[in-house]
A protein has these predicted regions:
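SAM-dependent transferase fold signal centered on methyltransferase-like domains
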Residues: 1-191
Length: 191
């Protein structure tokens, strides 16, 4: 940090929620909060959201790809409050499950999340969110219904049969069904 001449930061070897707890009061919250654990980040969502200032950026990394891809659906339900399905777009479903869990926690705290950017690499998923300390966000939790017979898919609020071939559909969720990134933020990143 000295090489980059950054002085307004803090690190700790304390347990993460204990550390974030000391920054959860108004005036002490961070403008950028990064959660990058080994495995699932969900147990840190509550304290990380509380430690992020209004208008600040929360970045979250998940490395438990097997859970998010449905190899253990019960584990995914327990950790992310959602069910994945195996499809050709499983990576997107995994990201949406992470965002859905964040939305669930943020909603309980009356905080709005706005995804700015999401990414996937071979061994992790990462989401960058703007945090706003005001409720009133349009409900962004729902389900993705996928028909294995014909590949049809759509986001809904409840399970249905496929409207193309009337087959039984698989359902992933509840998960984030809103926008995955802010266009202006991504454009600025590219500059």
């Amino acid at each position: 940090m000295k090489l980059n001449e950054i002085s307004n930061f803090d690190t700790s070897e304390n347990e993460i929620c204990h550390f974030f707890g000391s920054y959860s009061k108004k005036g002490k919250r961070g403008s950028i909060v990064d959660v990058d654990p080994f495995g699932s980040p969900t147990k840190y969502f509550d304290c990380a959201i509380r430690a992020t200032m209004h208008g600040g950026m929360l970045s979250v990394t998940a490395t438990d790809l097997q859970v998010l891809h449905g190899l253990s659906k019960r584990s995914c339900q327990r950790k992310y409050h959602g069910v994945p399905i195996k499809t050709e777009y499983s990576n997107e479903i995994a990201i949406r499950l992470i965002l859905g869990c964040l939305e669930f926690v943020a909603g309980r705290l009356e905080i709005q999340i706005i995804p700015q950017f999401v990414q996937h690499d071979m061994h992790y998923y990462r989401a960058y969110l703007k945090i706003l300390n005001k409720p009133g966000q349009k409900e962004q939790l729902g389900y993705i219904v996928h028909c294995k017979s014909c590949g049809s898919r759509k986001s809904v609020m409840k399970q249905e049969t496929c409207n193309i071939c009337n087959s039984k559909t698989d359902v992933a969720g509840p998960l984030w069904i809103g926008q995955l990134f802010e266009k202006e933020f991504v454009m600025k990143m590219n500059e």
